Each structure stands twice: as structure tokens, then as C-alpha cells.
Curated annotation (Swiss-Prot):
Name recorded for this polypeptide: DNA replication licensing factor MCM4
Location within or outside the cell: Nucleus; Chromosome
PROSITE patterns referenced in this protein's UniProt entry, alphabetically: MCM_1, MCM_2
Gene: MCM4
Residue ranges of the region described as Disordered: 1-60, 91-126
Species for this entry: Homo sapiens
Length: 863
């Protein structure tokens, strides 16, 4: 028997020769892979060899390298094998490899499932550190003692000790900081993870999410091993939890063995600080998903067949590579093995691009991105626009200089293999992970919210909790509050009537310095899927989507913009008036149809953009001109303005009493006491929970009484204008009233829209129209200002001027041509009102449209 310091020889008997790391497994045997593996191990009559760890060995020699990267030494034929074999990723997580069943099955038919998120564990050799060259029979005498000595090569992970420590953690850990609101249905005085295993038995989802902070507080050494060697430790955790589970629930049959998913690693880093020391370690980073790829099938196990003798072999993937057998194991023919695709094993894979969150970005820096790879059931768990905390293993992959040459570049390409997603953001409305989706609120919290909804002034309370640092503007805050709640989405496409949007769009316009941008920022920081853009800094493709070449597949793919990323959220657009025409034109379809049609570079599709738009615009003269209409002040097309449900004006009143109250409020913000700040935080927490609960559970429908009230309100609005020849309401205004009434019913946590909701919707809509759709000449509300860009009074005056000009030209007799300036002075002399040059040119254009005259230069010719 060779000593530990001796260099093993490549020649000699089978007992002393190391087995290659990726030994193909023959399909000829009728036993399961784990049974075949034990049979191969038991065929050797050699002794257990210790790994050469002495400094006297030349580690650079080929013989030493052969040992360092070889399979574990083989045992005596009479040896009883261990309960687990770390060298194969297909067997870890199986409570006992001796259990009879189908090939690759666990306990009572629960199959074993490979974990591509961890990669292959074949390089994790089993090493007996305490062996001193004794006979194998002495080791076989105590299987228990052999298990205690098993350590994974290259680490300090003692498999038996690690497994025992994790089992003790599962059976004993009680979270001292647990709150009932966060652990609905969990007894916080009992071991937390044993109750989670009970849930797995009931629900049947074979995934156990383990908080790394809990492991650290229970066993710091176990936590250190998990962070440093996740690829080796997590399979050991899988084995431990499966043994406990199937001992506790022997009759349970799961889809596959339970997989442990650690999250909340305290080694949380900003993605721009990731460096080589993090490679192959467990990390947690946060960011926003900006792109997800299509599903990619990834081969996990290749099936090869000899073209000469039909001998078959399976080869497992090892760190993204599959070693094709060069020689047939039966007939020894070289290069005769062919890959059989339909017998190979594949797993789902998805590439995700994660971008740094704006709040984590240093000043003056552009956002960093990192590539994630999700596997199996984690595919399609997140969508573009989601803010997530990702726990995974940081990988570095070499890049070949040439695909045909094995030489690689010195710079490696990095990515993260995802182990756990957690959708969360503490500042926003509600952060959910997969455990909390179904049980967001405890019964006590729901009862508190329902009790709050019964208060008669709940509407005013919630509005005052919204942006408390901004003075007054109560109606504007109420409008934004209703926008946060939203209406009820209705889909009648199966009857041919299409879909009706539930999102409410609001435009804030007025003087500079009236808190418009602050309101937008407040809403952006509150909603879970919000996007914030500025008019000048946004392009049409930045809002919609643009085509780029995928660096992985080299194919053209669609990269989504702000409107698509804020699907089911709110898109805040500041400096709305400064957007160019091509950028604003893309909003027409989004604001009404809630979709985005794309036809670029051969990619034709329709994306969902079910987003509410909250926009802010300044007047073109830097100050609001009360003598002009809204459209004349902000120079926005009427086709776009008509799509806003509410248009509010924020004007500077220039009143001394108001200025004094405002200054007192602003100064008070600077010496706010801790009690006041804490009270505001409590109000914010209640507001978040209230809106989240209403969103997820309340879907109000119109009652008969509310339907009649809406009909009467619409008819009354039409009557107001018809008496003066004006249009004061269109069907879009009726739809806006319905959405506002539904949102107000959600504020009351009512599933039925009552007349009181319609009354508030009418009042708020009327207040907004008073400000934005009032004709400055007459002081009367005229909705046609927003829908056609011109009030009825202006239209009537334009028609009268054109008629007067026509009479003036006819009174001059049959004159073939008239001078432009002379005609302008004549009409000004006859008119009682001041006629500007623009009004005169509009009248000429109206007559030209009627084929009465034509204007050539400075000459007017009759037709």
C-alpha cells in the first residue's frame, strides 16, 4: 500500500489506479444508477487510500495532478456503502440510497431532481482525512465512524457534521424576533422550519426557503461554510432536510426531493462592488429586472450510443460542459459515440438582466447590470420592472479565443446562478415573495384595516397621509389617492365588446414651484412598479421599446421601455410639455387602449402597458396666463389632453395670508419633533397596507342606484352645454366618472359602488373641469377646449369673422384681386372688437377651405 507522501503510479493493478472524474455510466445494467455506482465501487478489492496532502508531493507533476482531480479511492468489496454519495448531483437529497424504487427515485416514489442552479458536484471529492493507511476491514467495522471522517475535497466541510448541524438547526430554531403579521399561521413559540416542513407536506411544494440570518444566529460556522462553499453545502442541506421530512411524513409523495433555498445572505453587496473574491460564493444583490429571455433548454445529462455495437452511455454535465466519450466502453472503437437527443435530459433555463436600482447608484454614475441565469421552476418568476433581491452563486466562465481552439481569454465572463428570488422593497406599497403572496396580511391586520374603513372620514384621513409635507392641495391629493386605488378592470372581449381600462390618468399643470415634481416623486417612491421619467430626457423608444442585438444569442431582441416596465403601476412623467411631438405620440395608444404595438426590425408584437400616467407640465410663458385656455398655456395637443381623466391646475395665488400660512408650514418641517416624524411613518405604513389590501381583495361593481346616478350625471353635464350651443361632456367623461366612483368604493373597502361614490366622483371631476376647461372669455366650463382645442365661443367668433370678411369682399364688387394689407385694415375698421393678425389669417383660411378665395403672397384672389 502506498504511503500518503508517495506519488501514485498510473500503471499497476486496478486497486491503485484513480478513476477519471467523469466516468460514463453504462445503460446495460438493469439496476438504478445509485445501485450501479455501489456495484462498481464494490468490485475493487483495494484499500481506502488517503489523498496526498503532504508538502513533500510535487503538486505540479502529472501523476499528482491525476490524483488531485480524480474520483474517490475505491472500497473493499465487503464494505457497506454510505447512505449518500456527494460525488453525483443526481443522488444528493435522497434520504437513503438503499430504498427500493424506480431508477432515480427517492422515498416512496418521490423522484430525485438535479439542481442546475448549483452546477455539478462531481468535483467535490470524498476524502478520508483521518486515514493513516490502515486496512479497509478496520474501516468497514464502523460505518458510523467512516461517515464522521468524510470531508469534501478543497473545503473544511465535514459532510456528517454539516448535515447534523443543519438538522439540529431545523429542529430547534425559534425566531426570537418573529412577528405574527409576518408569519401568518405560524406558532412563533415552536421551531419555525419544522412548521414549514408541515406546510410542504400539506401544499406539496418541495422547496424550503431558509433565512441565512437565522443560520448565522444559530451556528456561525455553518453559516460561514454555506457562504464560502454553497455548491458543496446546499446539497448536504438537501440530504438533511429530506431525511427529517420523510422520517416525519413517511407516506408523503412529492414532485421531487425537497430543495433548500437560502436567502438573505448577509454578504449582500451592491452589484458594482462584486469582485473576484466573491466567485463561487453565495451572495445577495438587489436591483430591477430590465429584461428576461425566452426559455432555453439546457442539457443536463447526455445520452451517447455507439454506432458500431449500440452500446449506450450517459454523461452528466459538469459546470456547463459535457465530456463526449472518445472510446466505446464495449468494443473500444474510437470516435464512434453519437449523441441521441431524445434520450438526453434537459432542464429549463432563462437569462435575466438585472439593473442597479436608482437609489443604490452613486451620484453621477450610470447604472450597472449583471446577468442572471434561472433554472427549472424559477423560470418566469420575475418580469421586467420587478424590483427583486436575488440570492445566488457568483460564477466566472472562461471565454474561448476561437470556438475551434481550446485557448481561453484571460478575462472571464461573470454571471449569477439564481437560487432564490424575493420581490421586496421596504419603501414601497407591498413587497411580496412566493411565501407571502397568498397570506399578505394577518387576521388582526385585516380587522384593523376594516375597522379603519368604517370611519366616516377615512377618505380625508388617507388623503392627508399622502405627501403630508406638501401644503393644502386637498382635491389634488384626493385625485392622486383615487389613482393609486384605481378602478375595476373589465374584459368583455369574449362578447366582442373589448376591454375597458381601470387606470386613471392625471395631469398636473401650473406655475413653477407649486410642488408638482414633489408629488410625482412621492408617488414614484410609493408604488411597487413605478417609473419616473422627464420630458427632455425621454425619447419615443425609451418610453416604448427598442431593438437591440442580444450579446448571448446574437439575435435581435426587444428591449422594453418605461411604459412597459411600469405595467400594473404608475408612470410619472415630469416636464410633460417639453417632450417632442414624436415622443408624445406614443402615449395615445397607451393611455386609452393600454397596449403598445411594435413593428420594428421584423419584430411585430403587442405589449401590455396597463399603466396609469401621472404627468406634470409648466406653462410656456413660465407663468399661467388666466386669459388663455389650458391648451394655449401648455401647448399640448387636444387629442392627448382628452385622455386624462383629471386635469388639475396648481396656481400661485399671490395672497399675503396664504403666503404666511405656507411659510409657517415650510418652516415647521425643519424643526419637526421625533414624535411627529414617527406618527407620519405610522400613517405611511397604514396607507401602504390599506392600498395593498384594497388592490388585492376589493373589486367593486356598480349597483343599480349608482348606475342611475351616473346616467343622470352624464345627462346633466350634456344639458349644461346644449342650452348655449356648447358641448360640456363626451362618453370619455362618463367612463372617467365610472373609474373614479369605483376607486372611491375601494377607499371604503366596499365591493359595491353606491350613490355616495358617484357624488364624490362628480364633485372631483367638476372641480378639475372648473380649472382646466373653463373658457377664459366667458367663465363657463366648455369641455370642447380639451377635446377639440377650441372653445365654442372662439369657434363662433371665428365663423362670424369669416362671414364678415366674405361680405366685405363681396361689397367691393367684382374685383379679381385685393391687397392683403388693405383688406386687413378694412376689416379692423368695421369690427367692434380688436382683430389680431392671427384671427384675420384664420378667417382667410376658412374662406379658402370653402373655395371662395386663394391667398398668393400678399394678394387675395377670388375664385
Amino acid at each position: 500500500m502506498s504511503s500518503p507522501a508517495s506519488t501514485p503510479s498510473r500503471r499497476g493493478s486496478r486497486r491503485g489506479r484513480a478513476t477519471p472524474a467523469q466516468t460514463p455510466r453504462s445503460e446495460d445494467a438493469r439496476s438504478s444508477p445509485s445501485q450501479r455506482r455501489r456495484g462498481e465501487d464494490s468490485t475493487s478489492t483495494g484499500e481506502l487510500q488517503p489523498m496526498p496532502t503532504s508538502p513533500g508531493v510535487d503538486l505540479q507533476s502529472p501523476a499528482a495532478q491525476d490524483v488531485l482531480f480524480s474520483s474517490p479511492p475505491q472500497m473493499h468489496s465487503s464494505a457497506i456503502p454510505l447512505d449518500f454519495d456527494v460525488s453525483s448531483p443526481l443522488t444528493y437529497g435522497t434520504p437513503s440510497s438503499r430504498v427500493e424504487g424506480t431508477p432515480r427515485s427517492g422515498v416512496r416514489g418521490t423522484p430525485v431532481r438535479q439542481r442546475p442552479d448549483l452546477g455539478s458536484a462531481q468535483k467535490g471529492l470524498q476524502v478520508d482525512l483521518q486515514s493513516d493507511g490502515a486496512a479497509a476491514e478496520d474501516i468497514v467495522a464502523s460505518e458510523q465512524s467512516l461517515g464522521q471522517k468524510l470531508v469534501i475535497w478543497g473545503t473544511d466541510v465535514n459532510v456528517a457534521a454539516c448535515k447534523e448541524n443543519f438538522q439540529r438547526f431545523l429542529q430547534r430554531f425559534i425566531d426570537p424576533l418573529a412577528k405574527e403579521e409576518e408569519n401568518v399561521g405560524i406558532d412563533i413559540t415552536e421551531p419555525l422550519y419544522m412548521q414549514r416542513l408541515g406546510e410542504i407536506n400539506v401544499i406539496g411544494e418541495p422547496f424550503l426557503n431558509v433565512n441565512c440570518e437565522h443560520i448565522k444566529s444559530f451556528d456561525k460556522n455553518l453559516y460561514r461554510q454555506l457562504i464560502s462553499y454553497p455548491q458543496e453545502v446546499i446539497p448536504t442541506f438537501d440530504m438533511a432536510v429530506n431525511e427529517i421530512f420523510f422520517d416525519r411524513y413517511p407516506d408523503s409523495i412529492l414532485e421531487h426531493q425537497i430543495q433548500v433555498r437560502p436567502f438573505n445572505a448577509l454578504k449582500t453587496k451592491n452589484m458594482r462592488n462584486l469582485n473576484p473574491e466573491d466567485i463561487d460564493q453565495l451572495i445577495t444583490i438587489s436591483g430591477m429586472v430590465i429584461r428576461t429571455s425566452q426559455l432555453i433548454p439546457e442539457m443536463q445529462e447526455a445520452f451517447f450510443q455507439c454506432q458500431v455495437c449500440a452500446h449506450t452511455t450517459r454523461v452528466e454535465m459538469d459546470r456547463g460542459r459535457i465530456a463526449e466519450p472518445s472510446v466505446c466502453g464495449r468494443c473500444h472503437t474510437t470516435h464512434s459515440m453519437a449523441l441521441i437527443h431524445n434520450r438526453s435530459l434537459f432542464s429549463d433555463k432563462q437569462m435575466i438582466k438585472l439593473q442597479e436600482s436608482p437609489e443604490d447608484m452613486p451620484a453621477g454614475q450610470t447604472p450597472h447590470t449583471v446577468i442572471l441565469f434561472a433554472h427549472n421552476d424559477l423560470v418566469d418568476k420575475v418580469q421586467p420592472g420587478d424590483r427583486v433581491n436575488v440570492t445566488g452563486i457568483y460564477r466566472a466562465v472562461p471565454i474561448r479565443v476561437n470556438p475551434r481552439v481550446s485557448n481561453v481569454k484571460s478575462v472571464y465572463k461573470t454571471h449569477i446562478d439564481v437560487i432564490h428570488y424575493r420581490k421586496t422593497d421596504a419603501k414601497r406599497l407591498h413587497g411580496l415573495d412566493e411565501e407571502a403572496e397568498q397570506k399578505l396580511f394577518s387576521e388582526k391586520r385585516v380587522e384593523l384595516l376594516k375597522e379603519l374603513s368604517r370611519k366616516p372620514d377615512i377618505y380625508e384621513r388617507l388623503a392627508s397621509a399622502l405627501a403630508p409635507s406638501i401644503y393644502e392641495h386637498e382635491d389634488i391629493k384626493k385625485g392622486i389617492l383615487l389613482q393609486l386605488f384605481g378602478g375595476t378592470r373589465k374584459d368583455f372581449s369574449h362578447t366582442g365588446r373589448g376591454k375597458f381600462r381601470a387606470e386613471i390618468n392625471i395631469l398636473l399643470c401650473g406655475d413653477p414651484g407649486t410642488s408638482k415634481s414633489q408629488l410625482l416623486q412621492y408617488v414614484y417612491n410609493l408604488v411597487p412598479r413605478g417609473q419616473y421619467t422627464s420630458g427632455k430626457g425621454s425619447s419615443a423608444v425609451g418610453l416604448t421599446a427598442y431593438v437591440m442585438k442580444d450579446p448571448e444569442t446574437r439575435q435581435l431582441v426587444l428591449q422594453t421601455g418605461a411604459l412597459v416596465l411600469s405595467d400594473n403601476g404608475i408612470c410619472c412623467i415630469d416636464e410633460f410639455d417639453k417632450m417632442n411631438e414624436s415622443t408624445r405620440s406614443v402615449l395615445h395608444e397607451v393611455m386609452e387602449q393600454q397596449t403598445l404595438s411594435i413593428a420594428k426590425a421584423g419584430i411585430i408584437c403587442q405589449l401590455n402597458a396597463r399603466t396609469s400616467v401621472l404627468a406634470a407640465a409648466n406653462p410656456i410663458e413660465s407663468q399661467w396666463n388666466p386669459k388663455k385656455t389650458t391648451i394655449e398655456n401648455i401647448q399640448l395637443p387636444h387629442t392627448l389632453l382628452s385622455r386624462f381623466d383629471l386635469i388639475f391646475l396648481l396656481l400661485d395665488p399671490q395672497d399675503e395670508a396664504y403666503d404666511r400660512r405656507l411659510a409657517h408650514h415650510l418652516v415647521a418641517l425643519y424643526y419637526q419633533s421625533e414624535e411627529q416624524a414617527e406618527e407620519e411613518l405610522l400613517d405611511m405604513a397604514v396607507l401602504k397596507d390599506y392600498i395593498a389590501y384594497a388592490h388585492s381583495t376589493i373589486m367593486p361593481r356598480l349597483s343599480e342606484e349608482a348606475s342611475q346616478a351616473l346616467i343622470e350625471a352624464y345627462v346633466d353635464m350634456r344639458k349644461i352645454g346644449s342650452s348655449r350651443g356648447m358641448v360640456s361632456a363626451y362618453p370619455r367623461q362618463l367612463e372617467s366618472l365610472i373609474r373614479l366612483a369605483e376607486a372611491h368604493a375601494k377607499v371604503r373597502l366596499s365591493n359595491k359602488v353606491e350613490a355616495i361614490d358617484v357624488e364624490e366622483a362628480k364633485r372631483l371631476h367638476r372641480e378639475a373641469l372648473k380649472q382646466s376647461a373653463t373658457d377664459p372669455r366667458t367663465g363657463i366650463v366648455d369641455i370642447s377646449i380639451l377635446t377639440t382645442g377650441m372653445s365654442a365661443t372662439s369657434r363662433k367668433r371665428k365663423e362670424e369673422l369669416a362671414e364678415a370678411l366674405k361680405k366685405l369682399i363681396l361689397s367691393k364688387g367684382k374685383t379679381p384681386a385685393l391687397k392683403y394689407q388693405q383688406l386687413f385694415e378694412d376689416i379692423r375698421g368695421q369690427s367692434d372688437i380688436a382683430i389680431t393678425k392671427d384671427m384675420f389669417e384664420e378667417a382667410l383660411r376658412a374662406l379658402a377651405d370653402d373655395d371662395f378665395l386663394t391667398v398668393t403672397g400678399k394678394t387675395v384672389r377670388l375664385l
